[in-house]
């Protein structure tokens, strides 16, 4: 049995954390979700391990913004390969461009409907599972 897909969810809003955890709970044992309420807490957890398969990071947080956390992740050689999805209420092109300039893997806009969020989480889980299970037979002599 393969291990569950590990998600680190970082958001300073307890209501958003709770709602997202409910969305993730629909995946049952396929996902494990850890949460952090600040960027500082998230960086500490990432450096201690275990590494998540994806970090979902709120953009607008006090003290350390999501952009600052993303920059710190990408500046750390031990963390830079972790995919980071930015989650924000802003759909401003400048915010989206900044996220991708800092090497975010994806940028999702928060909305009243979390269906798109669920769909994107499903896509990450599917990609992760398929990328770790070869779909081709081993070649003789390799």
Where do the model's predicted regions map?
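His-Asp phosphorelay/catalytic-motif detector in bacterial-type signaling
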Residues: 3-4, 30, 50-54, 78-83
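Active-site residues of response regulator receiver
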Residues: 57-58, 88
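CheY-like receiver
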Residues: 119, 126-142
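Acidic, metal-coordinating helix/loop segments flanking the phosphotransfer/catalytic sites
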Residues: 35-54
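Receiver (REC) domain active-site loop signature in two-component systems and cognate sites
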Residues: 61
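Short, glycine/charged-rich "phosphate-handling" switch motifs in NTP-dependent
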Residues: 105
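Conserved acidic segment of CheY-like receiver
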Residues: 4-15, 20-24, 55
């Amino acid at each position: 049995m393969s291990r569950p897909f590990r998600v680190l969810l970082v958001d300073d809003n307890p209501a958003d954390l709770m709602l997202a955890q409910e969305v993730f709970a629909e995946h049952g044992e396929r996902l494990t979700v850890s949460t952090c309420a600040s960027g500082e807490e998230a960086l500490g957890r990432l450096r201690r391990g275990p590494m998540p398969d994806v970090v979902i990071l709120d953009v607008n947080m006090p003290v350390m913004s999501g952009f600052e956390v993303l920059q710190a992740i990408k500046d750390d050689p031990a963390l830079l390969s972790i995919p980071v999805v930015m989650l924000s209420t802003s759909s401003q092109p400048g915010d989206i461009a900044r996220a991708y300039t800092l090497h975010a893997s994806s940028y999702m806009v928060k909305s009243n409907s979390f269906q798109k969020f669920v769909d994107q989480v499903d896509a990450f889980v599917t990609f992760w599972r398929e990328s770790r299970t070869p779909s081709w037979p081993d070649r003789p002599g390799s």
